[in-house]
């Protein structure tokens, strides 16, 4: 068993693909993400969390307007069941009425079936919201199939896409925010990363690892 102690509150069991994270308190972003993930876990839906929230989850000091979830495609009735369960837990559907079966089905046909993302809000909050989409590309399926399990405070379970893919993908857009996220994750998990895997994704996405050092020197 290979376990890396990343920091005082993070341990990474590489062999099991599991990260143990202890947080003194959960942020609003955390609570919303955990509740949404709990619903997916309960229904057995395969998913991963991608993009900015992953860095925030591990302590990057910034806020995000959205939390990105990507799942295996859902059948229409599965999506209906999912939405009704989310409704009971306080979520709202931006593109439709989460309390109406016909509205949920219209959103499914008009958005998810056509490859568009949809958004959910929680309670009276506008931000952060959940951006929800279903996998379409091999890269998206890879992120789900090889997701890591993060166990937060020994009670919450959330799946994230592989760190190597997250870092490479964050370098691809080249925005300051994305570069900052990539530097944060790379610096934090450097000892535990599969560097061969990281270089594979850097090559696939045609980005240079030196961008991490350049971006890091700015911060």
Residue ranges and their predicted role:
Residues 2-219:
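Compositionally biased terminal segments of proteins
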């Amino acid at each position: 068993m290979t376990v890396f102690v990343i920091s005082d509150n993070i341990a990474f069991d590489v062999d099991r693909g599991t990260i143990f994270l202890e947080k003194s308190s959960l942020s609003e972003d955390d609570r919303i993400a955990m509740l949404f993930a709990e619903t997916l876990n309960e229904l057995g839906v395969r998913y991963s969390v991608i993009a900015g929230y992953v860095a925030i989850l591990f302590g990057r000091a910034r806020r995000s307007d959205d939390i990105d979830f990507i799942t295996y495609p859902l059948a229409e009735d599965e999506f209906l069941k999912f939405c009704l369960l989310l409704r009971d837990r306080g979520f709202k559907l931006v593109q439709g009425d989460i309390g109406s079966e016909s509205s949920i089905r219209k959103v499914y046909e008009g958005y998810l079936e056509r490859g568009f993302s949809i958004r959910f809000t929680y309670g009276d909050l506008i931000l952060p919201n959940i951006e929800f989409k279903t996998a379409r590309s091999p890269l998206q399926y890879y992120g789900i199939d090889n997701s890591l399990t993060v166990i937060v405070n020994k009670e919450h379970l959330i799946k994230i896409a592989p760190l190597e893919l997250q870092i490479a993908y964050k370098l691809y857009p080249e925005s300051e925010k994305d570069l900052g996220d990539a530097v944060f994750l790379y610096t934090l998990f450097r000892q535990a990363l599969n560097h061969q895997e990281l270089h594979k994704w850097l090559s696939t996405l045609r980005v240079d690892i030196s961008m991490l050092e350049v971006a890091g020197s700015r911060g």
